[in-house]
Swiss-Prot record:
Record-level GO BP terms: tRNA modification
Chain positions of site Interaction with substrate tRNA: 100, 123
Subunit architecture: Monomer.
Organism of this sequence: Clostridium botulinum (strain Okra / Type B1)
Stated family: Belongs to the IPP transferase family.
Protein name, per record: tRNA dimethylallyltransferase
Gene Ontology MF: a single term: tRNA dimethylallyltransferase activity
Gene it is expressed from: miaA
Gene3D superfamilies: 1.10.20.140, P-loop containing nucleotide triphosphate hydrolases (3.40.50.300)
InterPro entries: Dimethylallyltransferase (IPR039657), IPT (IPR018022), P-loop_NTPase (IPR027417)
Claim: Transferase is one of the keywords in the record: yes
Amino acid sequence: MIDLLIIAGPTAVGKTDISIKLAEKLNGEIISADSMQIYKYMDIGSAKITKDEMKGIPHHLIDVVEPHEEFNVSSFKDLAEKSIKDIWNRGKLPIIAGGTGLYINSLIYNYDFTDADRDEKYREYLTKLAEDKGNEYVHSLLKDIDEESYEKLYPNDLKRVVRALEVYKITGKSISEYIKENEKKLYDIPYNVNYFILNMNREVLYERINKRVDIMMGKGLIEEVKKLESMGYTPDMQSMKGIGYKEVLFYLNGDISLDEAIYLIKKGSRNYAKRQLTWFRKDKRSIWIDKDKYSSEEEIVDKIIKMVKDK
């Protein structure tokens, strides 16, 4: 069985530094579980790790696809599983680091996101419905059939909303029901999972998020978005709907002021962190690490290593 170490948590909590220190001490390589860092050219807005910050530790699933290309949880699962096997077969420890809970779940739960047959006509109908009546309307259709997905997914995540509705139409079951009916096989995975969630005081986390946004602006987020536009990437693409990118696009189009854009990026990032924490709390296998209780990152790293070895 393959040992798999997972370091997750909300945006700006400090997953990158902890995961690198762990990789250094445990002879590991890092697989990014971040739905924005998979895109090329989108470096500043995704807070993508730099080559210097990697400190020589190999990183996987960063800069995987072009911003216009389709990439979903199934794509991630396929690439991540290949990377895990490759890292393990070379005698190293695969470490998953990131904040996209759905990506992480695709590895630690044994369910197939593509089990139900597809209904292209229904997908096209829902997409057209979103164009005519808005994403919020299509999202509202989930409420009566799958309240959990309704709460979990947000309206602009149209692809996943459509998928949830499609599964219900084909199977007569919500995705939530489908998963519950298959709970016995859910944990039948080829990994020995050690799953840690980093967290900290909410006020401190929000301060870090606000500061990170200011740093992004200082590094040239506006110029990055301008460059992406000049390369032909448009607001309707999934990648360009990411927090930071959509707000700057609004600013560049003259819809809002720069101050408003910065405010919205900070607010959107804080709300995203809140949603991430809600997601991670649902997994009973995860061990929470309160960073406020430790005097240094080294102490946190040593604590995680001890818990892994004592398991």
